[in-house]
Amino acid sequence: MTLHWSLLLFIAIALVSSVAQAAVVEHTFNVGNFSISQLCQPPLIITAVNGQLPGPTIYAREGDTVVVHLVNTSPYSMTLHWHGVLQRGTPWADGPAMVTQCPVQPGGNYTYRFNVDGQEGTLWWHAHVSFHRATVYGALVIRPRGGAKAYPFPKPDKEHVVILGEWWNATVYDMERMAFLTGIPAPHADAYTINGKPGDFYNCSAPNQTAKFEVRQNGTYLLRIINAGMNTPLFFKVAKHRLTVVGADACYTKPYKTDVVVVSPGQTVDALMVASAAVGRYYMAASPYDSAIPQGPPFSDTTATAILQYAGARRKTVRWRPPVLPRRPPVNDTATAHRFFSGMTALLRHGKPSAVPLAVDTHMYVTVGLGVSLCQPEQLLCNRSAPPVFSSSMNNASFVVPKNTSLLEAHFRREPAGVYTRDFPDTPPVVFDYTGDESDNATMQFTTKSTKVKTLRYNETVEMVLQNTRLIAKESHPMHIHGFNFFILAQGFGNYDKRRAERRFNLVDPQERNTIAVPTGGWAVIRFVADNPGMWYMHCHFDAHISLGLAMVLEVLDGPTPETSVPPPPADLPRCS
């Protein structure tokens, strides 16, 4: 009896201790306009959070509740998305405009509240309406509940958040609006940035426009690398230093040693770096990876830099010596990109096997790529006598968000009529040579505008082949799924061949991600369990492509209990104007 009560007391203390360790992490994000000068241009009005570029970093521990009060003092409609947060039980906090909520209007506010159970690593947050995420973004760092000593890798001496971005010498909202009205894609960025700063290799860069990171010789540092860029995958290197990747998209990986990290928009990488070089100054460099074949319009083939500065490197003889610059990969180095993307595997912990599901309920074969469409009625400046304008699609369905009701509200009310249809196709409408350079299926270039969703039963296991197409150009598309992580079973080039590919499936320790860079002119196979009820956006993380329709939505039906069902919307959920 004494042993019995002792055991109960121990369990009770453990439960109380566990609850006590969880905290509420609360922030107020004031989204407003302020002016900033970069690259010797006149002051530019940008939209940002709390007058910062990048915005504030949110630090939490696994199991914490995050509460963010969005106060919109900008002149634009606004939403925030918590990229990679699973949002189990909190689908109303996911953030994409007209998918899970109507935008917060100027002068309005909304409180995002969600939990980070079962997630550790680097995620991030960003605006999810128009092109505002070009300047409305920041890091979301989730540490283990047990602190740094609980990392499944050597404890770092310090951590650095490294956010890669893109910069335009223009107002991005006006740029996006003009692209829509004319049907002509928005221009490429004028510069790349590291922590909001372009660095030393742009004309007229000022000394205060280069980010700096302090290290001590032989120290170990955890770099939390985020590609918050709008449209460009980036190579990331540190001169004279090698990196050991230990995580990607807030999922631990087996240690992967490399001298170059490749991050597509939306992705994150956690990498350890030992400061083992001679005392001095070294450049971190972020340079573009252009995967398009044939290459499209000219883009900024430039390099953003930050300075890694060793303690003791302030002495004149060292300070006046220019930092060492790493050799950057060729801009079209697909081999290096593919080697990195396909080289990582999951870290299996505590002797547990991988959670990858082995039985599949639903198979989908989904083409992703560019196409064309006729001018839409709302495109008032579109040249209707010229050739068709650019579009993009998945299985030839070019996604259009609803105008008056968010998808999640229509789903919750069980009133889809007039808002969306449940007929997203499981396969392409026509089978053809998807990646052939001489593809003759010109009719498939024309896409159909629609708001189609794929409806899934609760707990259904889905295997999806993502197939790149060559109709306009082959290109690596970073495909992101809200509300889920997925396992990457295999990836390769050319047209997907089921028999050959299945022999290569990794069902033992496949990497787990929320965003996958589908190989240019190739394919990838992902698998996940639809155990999160709600309406979940799946889209290319090139904003130039999502605005053209390279998206769809997964509608996951309720499970058998209140805990496995979409809860009622919060009282302050914004209304559509």
UniProtKB/Swiss-Prot annotation:
One Pfam family in the UniProt entry: Cu-oxidase
Q: What is this protein called?
A: Laccase-25
Q: Which GO terms describe its cellular component?
A: apoplast
**Repeat is among the record's keywords:** yes
Q: Which SUPFAM superfamilies match?
A: Cupredoxins
Which residues participate in Cu cation 2 binding?
Answer: 83, 126, 541
Which parts of the sequence belong to the Plastocyanin-like domain?
30-147, 158-313, 423-560
Q: Which organism encodes this protein? A: Oryza sativa subsp. japonica
Name the InterPro entries for this protein.
Answer: Cu-oxidase-like_N (IPR011707), Cu-oxidase_2nd (IPR001117), Cu-oxidase_C (IPR011706), Cu-oxidase_fam (IPR045087), Cu_oxidase_Cu_BS (IPR002355), Cupredoxin (IPR008972), CuRO_1_LCC (IPR034288), CuRO_2_LCC (IPR034285)
